[in-house]
Amino acid sequence: MAVINKAGNVIALLLVKLQLILLFTLSVSGELPQLDYGSLSASLEEDAIDPLTAMAPFANSLVTEESAQHKNNAELLGNSSEDENVRPQQGSSSSGLGSSGAAGGSGILLEEFNSGKLSPGEASNTLPIFLIEPESVFVVKNRPAVLKCKASHSLQVIFKCSGSSQPPPSTHETHVDPHTGVNMEEVTATIHRDLVDEFFGDGPFKCECHAWSSRGVVKSQAATVHIAYIRKSFNQSPTSLRLELGSRAELRCEPPGGFPEPKLTWHKNNAVITADSEPGITVSAGTLIFRQVALQHMANYSCSAENIAGRRVSDSAVLIVYVNGGWSTWSPWRECKCAGKPSQGRKRSRTCNNPMPLNGGAQCPGPQIQKSADCAACPEDTQIVSPDGFDISSSKRMARWSAWSDWSICSAECIQVRRRKCLTQGQTQISSEAEEAGDLLLGAPGVGMAALIAAAGVGAVGSPSEATGSSSDIIPGYGKSLCAGKDIQTAECRGEQCQIGKDDFDWTLYLGLAFITAVCFAFGTALICCARRGIRTNPHYNMARSVMDADYMPGVVEKKEMRMHIEASNMGYDYVNPGHRYLPGEHIMGMGIGCGGVTEHHYDVPNLSANYTNPIDHLSVDYLSETGESSTADTSNSTFDMNGKLSILNASKSSTYEMLGSAGGQLRLYGGELLLFVPEHAIGKHVKKHVSLLLLSDECSRVSCATESSILCSSVVHSAPRNYSFVKPVILKIPHCLVAPEQWHVHIYHADSEHDELSVNWRRAVSVGEETINTPMFVQLEATHVFIMTEQLGHFTVVAEPRIQQPSIKMKLLAFSQHTPPSNANCSLRIYVVKDFPNSRDICANVEAKLGGSFLGESQVFAFTLNSRNLNIRVRSADVEAAAPYEHAIPYQHILSNNSILHCEFSLRRQDQNSLCVDFGQGSEDDYYTFNIPAHSMSGSAEELASTTNTTISIDRQGNYVNESCVMDFVQLPHATKRLICGALDPPRADERDWRLLAKKLNTDRYIAYFATKASPTEQILNLWECRANSSPGSSSNSVSHTIMALLLTLKEMGRQDVLDIIVETIGPLWI
């Protein structure tokens, strides 16, 4: 029987555990009914458990509390009833808890647990006890709120918030008390503002903590989460006041809206105002009260509002305390005394210093000086005339002269006139300034009246009332008899004011200037003639060292040979010369790899003077070797003896300069390929500037590129003046050698240096496509040219980096021949490989001119592909097919070394009857290019190079063209027309049919923000359009008319008929 009872007890215990597991599962899923846990715990604590009725209490509880569960599920968190019943009721008194509810029971259990009165067995059978409950908090936009909850005897603790079935982001921690073995759960929830904003239920957003154990679930008190904010603007800011000393004042401030209510604080000069720091100031809610303002209260006052969301400070209010002036006591009477006269009468004075006027306070009323009726008047030379008149007692009126008027204009008789008036005055006293001036001058005899009048500030011209003020009047019946002396003075005109008998033209001055000019011109001419004569007296300056007489160079018996075997070394000679300009290291380039047994021709370069006017035909050249092979050389480091600094403007054809003013102008080189456009009014009014434009060869400037893949793709351009900031951007047009510019990263390099400086500091000014609002330049990149808009001139060049594999650049070949005697069977042919720059031919021609060479011809421009392949050059006879060609390969790396005058040399047999063909290319022979050298070019006669035309175009103020030869070869809108167009297109429109659409139509809108930063965006766009539309000097007027017509069509497409009418009306039908 005992065994049966024991088995029954075990089964009952198992059923109880299964029931607890079921209850825990239901509670987690949200379907747990609100049970009477006190009755449940009392039933479980009975001494005897009937195995057949062990489930009865649970069944009864489930049935009786089902309706309560539905009722509680219908209520949402955040309602007022929820705050009253936040814990389940516990009804049995046998559990050790009172029947008053969960709040009281939990409080008793917490006290017993903390005091240690609760045994471990009793603790294991209790509901969870909250040690930390969440409290109401505020959440800010950028700072979330944190809620904490901690409970003992719990298996799990989570937060549940309004309007959400999922708990907020939380972190959980579990602890076990080492003394009691009680499990403790702690959870920290992070509440972001987004979660609060998403709640649209009734009442505020609330969160509560739920703790579960084997006995059931307990809810903590609800914590309210509010959104804290503070607005930016104050509802009322303090206003500035100007008050008299001792008056009462109030400053009012109403803080901006916010939650929680912002706390208001007053500040004086940014220091917080407290009752201790400012005893005379009372601070109340939003009001700052001054019982009696004092001078120490003058300050800047502001108020600040602060809450958990932030802090706001109002605008400052200035409190100005002014002081009205007060008179001091009268001084003792003293005698009236004038210089050289006995004393007569008395006077006394007082001072406006009790107190002195401060901060704009009123001056003291009334006179400063009192005089007796018989006070002696000083002579005329020390009389004082003031705007207030003279001080006269009320019993007697006295007359005084006013100040003299200004001298009149010279009459036809060369006479000037000035006048004065006899004035009288009533009760008005003399001003303090005039009296003080009179006191100072009493003892100074001989002081003129004009000085005293100037000190008193009397007007010179006007009626007596205007001179003396409103209180002055002229006594009826009295005239000039009251005043001694005359009222008019006349004088003869002085200086150059009188033009009687003088001619309009001063011949003496102009004859003197003409004489001085003639003397200076004669002196300058004599100096130039002497300088040229000194150069010609020594013919050895124009001779090579190899042809000088042995007597002139004693000790030099024979000239040493200078040979270099290309197979032995690939480095070229780096001739050292003190006058030669070079950059160490980077300018030394490797030579081309030639055939076996090949020697390179080197020349004894003649000593050249700095003056290039001497005939080049007198130069003598010796060959050091004669072979039938070819070689390559880098002539950028040739040993030209340029003693001193060679002026680029004198030594190069690639330069032009002009004195320009506000009318603007253009400077052109190489037929307009290189252009500097100075718009109208880019130079200040009444200012003229020496503007120059020149190309620098590679000898003069080398650009250190940032990366190995960077290529110098334009000539180095120097423009001046470099230290002048133009009023408007000028435009520089530079040709480049890029094929398909969109395949390259293009950069503009700039250096603020003179053209003859040895050390040039280059910097990257603009990277096309990477401009910012602070970029000082605008770059318009086109297929063949780059247009740069800038306000600062200096050195400019274009550097590019490839975007794709194997891009191409434009290059060409130039052929030159060495002058040799007709008896010589061999002739020398040098072929230069250069980039397609405008001055490439001039650079090579200058080198050849010094070596005695002549120009034979050039190839067409070809695309050199960056594919690491060498450039093969082959020279053959055009008439004899069987003749073996001369062939040479120039290494790929030598071509890309940024060296514009790399060349190879061929030594050929002279055959006057045969022409030559030069084949060149990188790939197979099918892709070779060919150009011919006529037979007569090899005969030895030098071909004159085509002269380079440098054009300077100037425009007058009305937009007319000054140079008649260039009247219609470029586009230029008159200034008046351009001004009207800018007035119509500069104002922005909602439909954007303004300067922005014009830039888009003219394809200049790549970086439109540059134009937006200028005073007139339309003017800059039109200036760039004019520069792009400029044609070469030889073009006809039809192309100019077509350009203007294209602009009219553009404006018509924009729908701006008003702008089109402006052009037609101001320019006329000439353009149309």
Curated annotation (Swiss-Prot):
It is a single-pass type I membrane protein. Residues 232-314 form the Ig-like C2-type domain. CDD domains: Death_UNC5-like (cd08781). The gene is unc-5. Residues 462-1072 are cytoplasmic. The keyword Repeat applies. Receptor for netrin required for motor axon guidance. Mediates both short- and long-range axon motor repulsion in the developing nervous system upon ligand binding. Also involved in glial migration. While short-range repulsion requires both fra and unc-5, long-range repulsion only requires unc-5. Residues 31-440 are extracellular. Prior to gastrulation, it is strongly expressed in the presumptive mesoderm. Mesodermal expression begins to fade during stages 13-14, persisting only in the cells that form the dorsal vessel. Expressed within the CNS from late stage 13, shortly after the first axons have extended. Detected in several dispersed clusters of cells within the CNS, increasing in number as development proceeds. Also expressed in the peripheral and exit glia, which migrate laterally out of the CNS between stages 14 and 17. InterPro entries: DEATH-like_dom_sf (IPR011029), Death_dom (IPR000488), Ig-like_dom (IPR007110), Ig-like_dom_sf (IPR036179), Ig-like_fold (IPR013783), Ig_sub (IPR003599), Ig_sub2 (IPR003598), TSP1_rpt (IPR000884). This is Netrin receptor unc-5.
